[in-house]
Amino acid sequence: VLTSMNYNFLRQAKKINPDIKTGYTMKMSYGGLEDMDAADFFSVKYTYITESFVEHAHSLGKEVCAWTLNYQGDMQRMVNCGVDNIITDDPELVRKVILGTTDRNPSFVSLLGYALK
């Protein structure tokens, strides 16, 4: 797997090896996904991912990876949006969110931290 924020680099890599799995890393969810054949998946900052973005990417045969989620509410939103992968510093919490076994309620401090981002 090769990921990059430089789409031209991914195009060059695909020319050299069309079988390599590539991911385009972006801070925002851009339009024009139809023209991004050199990317097999999109890695997007979670705050810019919507359900419609995920549906559109999936309709093109592309996966969506969300980064970097560390709060339960954000993780649940990404699961609800249908992302294929989640990048986190708390994999145990992601597992619990996916399995629906969380026993943690977001604390006021964590909610405040989220609000001040």
Question: Predicted regions: what is each one?
Answer:
Residues V1-K117:
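Short loop-to-alpha-helix "cap/lid" segments that border enzyme active sites
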